[in-house]
A protein has these predicted regions:
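N-terminal hydrophobic/helix-forming segments and targeting peptides
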Residues: 1-356
Length: 356
Protein backbone atom coordinates (compact mmCIF):
# COMPACT_ATOMS: atom_id res chain seq x y z
CA UNK A 1 0.00 0.00 0.00
CA UNK A 2 1.35 3.39 -1.03
CA UNK A 3 1.35 5.10 2.38
CA UNK A 4 4.16 7.42 1.30
CA UNK A 5 1.75 9.05 -1.17
CA UNK A 6 -0.87 9.49 1.55
CA UNK A 7 1.69 11.14 3.82
CA UNK A 8 2.79 13.53 1.08
CA UNK A 9 -0.81 14.43 0.30
CA UNK A 10 -1.59 15.11 3.96
CA UNK A 11 1.52 17.18 4.59
CA UNK A 12 0.96 19.40 1.54
CA UNK A 13 -0.87 22.59 2.60
CA UNK A 14 -4.12 23.46 0.86
CA UNK A 15 -7.10 25.24 2.43
CA UNK A 16 -10.38 26.00 0.62
CA UNK A 17 -9.58 28.27 -2.32
CA UNK A 18 -5.83 27.59 -2.10
CA UNK A 19 -5.56 23.96 -3.17
CA UNK A 20 -2.98 24.54 -5.92
CA UNK A 21 -0.08 22.75 -4.19
CA UNK A 22 -2.19 19.64 -3.62
CA UNK A 23 -3.40 19.78 -7.22
CA UNK A 24 0.16 19.99 -8.55
CA UNK A 25 1.12 16.89 -6.56
CA UNK A 26 -1.89 14.98 -7.88
CA UNK A 27 -1.19 16.05 -11.46
CA UNK A 28 2.23 14.40 -11.24
CA UNK A 29 0.78 11.21 -9.75
CA UNK A 30 -1.99 10.67 -12.32
CA UNK A 31 0.17 10.85 -15.45
CA UNK A 32 -0.59 7.84 -17.64
CA UNK A 33 -3.79 6.89 -15.80
CA UNK A 34 -6.14 9.21 -17.66
CA UNK A 35 -6.74 10.23 -21.27
CA UNK A 36 -7.63 13.85 -20.56
CA UNK A 37 -7.01 16.20 -17.65
CA UNK A 38 -7.97 19.82 -17.20
CA UNK A 39 -8.31 22.40 -14.46
CA UNK A 40 -11.63 24.23 -14.33
CA UNK A 41 -12.33 27.82 -13.31
CA UNK A 42 -12.82 26.82 -9.66
CA UNK A 43 -9.45 25.07 -9.57
CA UNK A 44 -10.80 21.51 -9.58
CA UNK A 45 -8.73 18.94 -11.48
CA UNK A 46 -10.98 16.95 -13.84
CA UNK A 47 -9.46 13.68 -15.08
CA UNK A 48 -11.15 11.51 -17.75
CA UNK A 49 -10.46 7.87 -18.49
CA UNK A 50 -12.22 6.56 -21.58
CA UNK A 51 -13.74 3.05 -21.76
CA UNK A 52 -11.19 0.26 -21.95
CA UNK A 53 -11.32 -3.08 -23.73
CA UNK A 54 -9.19 -6.14 -23.16
CA UNK A 55 -5.64 -5.48 -21.93
CA UNK A 56 -6.49 -1.87 -21.16
CA UNK A 57 -6.80 -0.59 -24.72
CA UNK A 58 -9.11 2.38 -25.30
CA UNK A 59 -12.44 1.07 -26.60
CA UNK A 60 -14.58 3.18 -28.91
CA UNK A 61 -18.21 2.06 -28.97
CA UNK A 62 -21.17 3.20 -31.04
CA UNK A 63 -23.15 4.46 -28.06
CA UNK A 64 -22.39 7.11 -25.48
CA UNK A 65 -20.83 5.41 -22.44
CA UNK A 66 -22.18 5.69 -18.94
CA UNK A 67 -20.24 8.40 -17.11
CA UNK A 68 -19.15 7.52 -13.58
CA UNK A 69 -17.78 10.47 -11.61
CA UNK A 70 -15.64 10.07 -8.50
CA UNK A 71 -15.52 13.23 -6.39
CA UNK A 72 -12.52 13.72 -4.09
CA UNK A 73 -12.06 17.10 -2.43
CA UNK A 74 -8.54 18.45 -2.07
CA UNK A 75 -9.05 21.12 0.59
CA UNK A 76 -8.35 20.82 4.30
CA UNK A 77 -9.73 23.03 7.04
CA UNK A 78 -7.49 25.98 7.81
CA UNK A 79 -7.40 29.72 8.20
CA UNK A 80 -6.90 32.94 6.27
CA UNK A 81 -4.92 35.81 7.75
CA UNK A 82 -7.42 38.55 8.60
CA UNK A 83 -5.07 41.05 10.27
CA UNK A 84 -1.48 41.66 11.36
CA UNK A 85 -1.39 44.06 14.30
CA UNK A 86 1.32 46.56 15.22
CA UNK A 87 2.94 44.09 17.63
CA UNK A 88 3.30 41.46 14.92
CA UNK A 89 0.55 39.15 16.12
CA UNK A 90 -1.28 37.44 13.28
CA UNK A 91 -5.06 37.12 13.52
CA UNK A 92 -7.01 34.66 11.43
CA UNK A 93 -10.43 33.77 10.08
CA UNK A 94 -11.39 30.08 9.80
CA UNK A 95 -12.02 28.33 6.48
CA UNK A 96 -13.90 25.24 7.62
CA UNK A 97 -15.25 23.96 10.91
CA UNK A 98 -12.96 24.04 13.94
CA UNK A 99 -13.61 23.06 17.55
CA UNK A 100 -11.77 25.70 19.56
CA UNK A 101 -10.98 23.11 22.25
CA UNK A 102 -8.52 21.53 19.81
CA UNK A 103 -6.65 24.72 18.89
CA UNK A 104 -4.61 25.32 22.04
CA UNK A 105 -0.81 25.45 21.66
CA UNK A 106 -0.74 24.24 18.07
CA UNK A 107 2.14 24.51 15.64
CA UNK A 108 1.03 26.08 12.38
CA UNK A 109 2.43 26.95 8.98
CA UNK A 110 1.75 30.43 7.60
CA UNK A 111 1.89 30.24 3.80
CA UNK A 112 2.77 33.50 2.07
CA UNK A 113 4.12 34.77 -1.24
CA UNK A 114 7.40 35.32 0.64
CA UNK A 115 7.68 31.71 1.76
CA UNK A 116 6.22 29.52 4.48
CA UNK A 117 6.76 30.43 8.14
CA UNK A 118 6.38 28.17 11.14
CA UNK A 119 4.41 29.59 14.02
CA UNK A 120 2.43 28.75 17.13
CA UNK A 121 -1.25 29.35 17.79
CA UNK A 122 -2.64 30.25 21.20
CA UNK A 123 -5.58 32.21 22.62
CA UNK A 124 -5.07 35.60 24.21
CA UNK A 125 -5.08 35.65 28.01
CA UNK A 126 -3.10 34.78 31.12
CA UNK A 127 -1.19 31.48 31.50
CA UNK A 128 -2.40 28.93 34.04
CA UNK A 129 0.01 30.19 36.75
CA UNK A 130 -1.72 33.56 37.11
CA UNK A 131 -5.22 32.96 35.74
CA UNK A 132 -8.39 32.64 37.82
CA UNK A 133 -10.45 29.42 37.99
CA UNK A 134 -13.12 31.06 35.82
CA UNK A 135 -10.54 31.99 33.19
CA UNK A 136 -9.07 28.47 33.17
CA UNK A 137 -12.47 26.83 32.71
CA UNK A 138 -13.65 29.03 29.86
CA UNK A 139 -13.12 27.78 26.29
CA UNK A 140 -12.09 30.70 24.05
CA UNK A 141 -13.82 31.37 20.75
CA UNK A 142 -11.87 30.71 17.56
CA UNK A 143 -11.57 34.45 16.92
CA UNK A 144 -9.54 34.83 20.16
CA UNK A 145 -6.63 32.75 18.84
CA UNK A 146 -3.58 34.47 17.37
CA UNK A 147 -0.35 33.29 15.74
CA UNK A 148 3.22 34.11 16.78
CA UNK A 149 5.90 33.43 14.14
CA UNK A 150 8.75 34.65 16.32
CA UNK A 151 9.85 37.57 14.13
CA UNK A 152 10.05 41.31 14.88
CA UNK A 153 6.77 43.12 14.31
CA UNK A 154 8.08 45.19 11.40
CA UNK A 155 9.28 42.08 9.57
CA UNK A 156 6.00 40.26 10.19
CA UNK A 157 4.06 43.19 8.74
CA UNK A 158 6.30 43.25 5.66
CA UNK A 159 6.14 39.49 5.16
CA UNK A 160 2.59 38.43 6.03
CA UNK A 161 -0.49 40.03 4.52
CA UNK A 162 -4.24 39.69 4.77
CA UNK A 163 -5.32 36.77 2.59
CA UNK A 164 -2.30 34.54 3.25
CA UNK A 165 -3.37 31.13 4.49
CA UNK A 166 -2.55 28.99 7.50
CA UNK A 167 -2.62 25.23 8.10
CA UNK A 168 -1.73 23.04 11.04
CA UNK A 169 1.89 21.88 10.97
CA UNK A 170 2.22 18.26 12.04
CA UNK A 171 3.87 15.28 10.28
CA UNK A 172 1.91 12.20 9.24
CA UNK A 173 2.69 9.10 11.30
CA UNK A 174 2.16 5.36 10.91
CA UNK A 175 1.09 3.59 14.11
CA UNK A 176 0.53 -0.11 13.56
CA UNK A 177 -2.34 -0.41 11.08
CA UNK A 178 -3.21 3.26 11.63
CA UNK A 179 -2.16 6.50 9.98
CA UNK A 180 -2.38 9.71 12.03
CA UNK A 181 -2.23 13.11 10.39
CA UNK A 182 -3.84 16.43 9.78
CA UNK A 183 -5.86 16.68 6.54
CA UNK A 184 -6.84 13.03 6.24
CA UNK A 185 -10.12 14.83 5.60
CA UNK A 186 -9.93 14.64 2.68
CA UNK A 187 -6.55 13.60 1.30
CA UNK A 188 -7.84 10.07 1.94
CA UNK A 189 -10.18 10.64 -1.01
CA UNK A 190 -7.40 12.09 -3.15
CA UNK A 191 -5.36 8.96 -2.43
CA UNK A 192 -8.32 6.76 -3.34
CA UNK A 193 -8.99 8.69 -6.54
CA UNK A 194 -5.42 7.92 -7.61
CA UNK A 195 -4.87 4.45 -6.18
CA UNK A 196 -8.23 2.93 -7.16
CA UNK A 197 -7.67 3.94 -10.78
CA UNK A 198 -4.06 2.76 -10.56
CA UNK A 199 -5.32 -0.64 -9.40
CA UNK A 200 -7.95 -0.73 -12.16
CA UNK A 201 -5.32 0.18 -14.75
CA UNK A 202 -2.80 -2.42 -13.60
CA UNK A 203 -5.47 -5.14 -13.54
CA UNK A 204 -6.01 -4.81 -17.29
CA UNK A 205 -9.74 -5.30 -16.71
CA UNK A 206 -12.07 -3.87 -19.33
CA UNK A 207 -14.60 -1.22 -18.33
CA UNK A 208 -17.40 0.03 -20.56
CA UNK A 209 -17.99 3.22 -18.58
CA UNK A 210 -16.14 6.50 -18.86
CA UNK A 211 -14.51 7.26 -15.52
CA UNK A 212 -14.14 10.87 -14.44
CA UNK A 213 -12.22 11.60 -11.26
CA UNK A 214 -12.75 15.15 -10.03
CA UNK A 215 -10.31 16.39 -7.41
CA UNK A 216 -12.49 19.22 -6.19
CA UNK A 217 -12.04 22.49 -4.33
CA UNK A 218 -13.75 24.25 -1.45
CA UNK A 219 -15.77 21.32 -0.10
CA UNK A 220 -15.20 22.39 3.49
CA UNK A 221 -17.02 25.68 2.87
CA UNK A 222 -20.02 24.33 0.95
CA UNK A 223 -19.21 21.73 -1.75
CA UNK A 224 -18.43 24.61 -4.10
CA UNK A 225 -15.95 23.01 -6.49
CA UNK A 226 -18.04 19.84 -6.72
CA UNK A 227 -21.10 21.83 -7.75
CA UNK A 228 -19.45 23.42 -10.77
CA UNK A 229 -17.51 20.28 -11.73
CA UNK A 230 -20.63 18.11 -11.56
CA UNK A 231 -22.60 20.60 -13.63
CA UNK A 232 -19.89 20.46 -16.32
CA UNK A 233 -19.45 16.67 -16.30
CA UNK A 234 -23.16 15.79 -15.86
CA UNK A 235 -22.46 12.25 -14.68
CA UNK A 236 -24.87 9.34 -14.81
CA UNK A 237 -23.42 8.02 -11.55
CA UNK A 238 -21.70 10.09 -8.87
CA UNK A 239 -19.52 8.55 -6.16
CA UNK A 240 -18.66 10.94 -3.35
CA UNK A 241 -15.46 9.74 -1.68
CA UNK A 242 -14.75 11.13 1.77
CA UNK A 243 -14.01 10.35 5.37
CA UNK A 244 -16.71 9.94 7.99
CA UNK A 245 -16.79 9.71 11.75
CA UNK A 246 -15.33 6.79 13.65
CA UNK A 247 -16.50 7.43 17.20
CA UNK A 248 -15.50 3.96 18.42
CA UNK A 249 -13.72 5.60 21.34
CA UNK A 250 -14.42 6.25 25.05
CA UNK A 251 -17.27 8.62 25.86
CA UNK A 252 -19.49 7.80 22.88
CA UNK A 253 -22.29 5.19 22.99
CA UNK A 254 -21.70 2.29 20.61
CA UNK A 255 -24.86 3.07 18.65
CA UNK A 256 -23.47 6.54 17.86
CA UNK A 257 -20.06 5.40 16.63
CA UNK A 258 -21.03 5.70 12.91
CA UNK A 259 -18.12 3.41 11.93
CA UNK A 260 -15.67 1.12 13.69
CA UNK A 261 -12.00 0.93 12.73
CA UNK A 262 -10.94 -2.28 11.03
CA UNK A 263 -14.42 -3.30 9.85
CA UNK A 264 -13.99 -2.11 6.28
CA UNK A 265 -14.97 0.83 4.10
CA UNK A 266 -18.19 2.72 4.80
CA UNK A 267 -21.16 2.19 2.50
CA UNK A 268 -22.70 5.61 3.03
CA UNK A 269 -26.50 5.49 3.23
CA UNK A 270 -27.28 9.11 4.09
CA UNK A 271 -26.11 12.31 5.72
CA UNK A 272 -27.40 15.86 5.98
CA UNK A 273 -26.84 16.60 2.29
CA UNK A 274 -28.03 13.56 0.34
CA UNK A 275 -29.39 10.02 0.45
CA UNK A 276 -27.52 7.38 -1.53
CA UNK A 277 -29.32 5.67 -4.41
CA UNK A 278 -30.71 2.33 -3.19
CA UNK A 279 -29.73 0.47 -6.36
CA UNK A 280 -26.15 1.74 -6.10
CA UNK A 281 -25.98 0.65 -2.47
CA UNK A 282 -27.11 -2.82 -3.51
CA UNK A 283 -24.59 -2.92 -6.39
CA UNK A 284 -21.64 -1.93 -4.21
CA UNK A 285 -22.73 -4.37 -1.53
CA UNK A 286 -22.85 -7.18 -4.10
CA UNK A 287 -19.36 -6.31 -5.38
CA UNK A 288 -17.99 -6.20 -1.83
CA UNK A 289 -19.49 -9.59 -1.01
CA UNK A 290 -18.29 -11.16 -4.26
CA UNK A 291 -14.70 -10.03 -3.69
CA UNK A 292 -14.82 -10.55 0.09
CA UNK A 293 -14.13 -6.90 0.80
CA UNK A 294 -15.01 -5.81 4.34
CA UNK A 295 -17.60 -3.06 4.62
CA UNK A 296 -20.01 -1.44 7.05
CA UNK A 297 -23.18 0.53 6.36
CA UNK A 298 -23.05 4.09 7.67
CA UNK A 299 -25.45 6.91 8.42
CA UNK A 300 -24.25 10.36 9.49
CA UNK A 301 -26.90 12.44 11.25
CA UNK A 302 -25.58 15.76 9.94
CA UNK A 303 -22.85 17.10 7.66
CA UNK A 304 -22.49 16.67 3.93
CA UNK A 305 -20.14 15.70 1.13
CA UNK A 306 -19.51 16.09 -2.59
CA UNK A 307 -21.80 13.22 -3.57
CA UNK A 308 -24.69 15.61 -2.97
CA UNK A 309 -23.42 17.96 -5.68
CA UNK A 310 -23.21 15.16 -8.24
CA UNK A 311 -26.70 13.95 -7.36
CA UNK A 312 -28.24 17.39 -7.86
CA UNK A 313 -26.30 18.61 -10.92
CA UNK A 314 -28.20 19.45 -14.12
CA UNK A 315 -30.93 16.80 -14.57
CA UNK A 316 -29.59 14.81 -11.60
CA UNK A 317 -27.58 11.63 -11.18
CA UNK A 318 -27.67 8.44 -9.18
CA UNK A 319 -25.22 8.96 -6.35
CA UNK A 320 -23.60 7.17 -3.46
CA UNK A 321 -20.95 7.83 -0.84
CA UNK A 322 -17.93 5.60 -0.23
CA UNK A 323 -16.26 6.63 3.01
CA UNK A 324 -13.44 5.75 5.39
CA UNK A 325 -14.04 5.95 9.14
CA UNK A 326 -11.81 8.55 10.81
CA UNK A 327 -11.23 9.14 14.49
CA UNK A 328 -10.68 12.65 15.94
CA UNK A 329 -11.88 14.33 12.75
CA UNK A 330 -11.05 18.00 12.11
CA UNK A 331 -8.00 17.85 14.37
CA UNK A 332 -4.26 17.40 13.77
CA UNK A 333 -4.55 13.81 15.02
CA UNK A 334 -7.10 12.45 12.57
CA UNK A 335 -6.69 8.67 12.45
CA UNK A 336 -7.65 6.03 9.89
CA UNK A 337 -7.13 2.28 9.72
CA UNK A 338 -5.26 1.26 6.57
CA UNK A 339 -7.37 -1.90 6.33
CA UNK A 340 -10.44 0.29 5.80
CA UNK A 341 -8.54 2.45 3.32
CA UNK A 342 -7.49 -0.61 1.32
CA UNK A 343 -11.05 -1.92 1.32
CA UNK A 344 -12.32 1.37 -0.13
CA UNK A 345 -9.69 1.26 -2.87
CA UNK A 346 -10.49 -2.35 -3.71
CA UNK A 347 -14.25 -1.93 -3.93
CA UNK A 348 -14.02 1.11 -6.21
CA UNK A 349 -11.58 -0.66 -8.54
CA UNK A 350 -13.80 -3.76 -8.58
CA UNK A 351 -17.04 -1.83 -9.10
CA UNK A 352 -16.08 0.20 -12.18
CA UNK A 353 -15.80 -2.80 -14.57
CA UNK A 354 -19.36 -3.83 -13.63
CA UNK A 355 -20.94 -0.64 -15.01
CA UNK A 356 -22.51 -1.10 -18.45
Amino acid sequence: MNIDLLKRLCETPGVPGREERVRELIQKEVKGLFDETRVDAMGSLICRRFPRGAKGKVAKGSKKPTVVMLLCHMDEIGFYVSAVDNKGWIWVNPAGGFDARNLFSRRVLVCTDNGDFKGVMNPGGRPIHISSPDERNKVPETKQFFIDIGLPADKVKKTVKVGDFVVMDEPALEMGTKVVSKALDNRVACWLGIEAIRKLDSSGNAHACEVVVAFTTQEEVGLRGAKTASHAVQPDIGIGIDVTLACDTPGVPEEESVTTHGKGFGLHIKDGSFISDKKLVDEFEAVAKKHRIAYQRTILAAGGQDGAAAQQAAAGARAIGIVVGTRYIHTVTEMIDTRDLGAARDVIAAYLPTVD
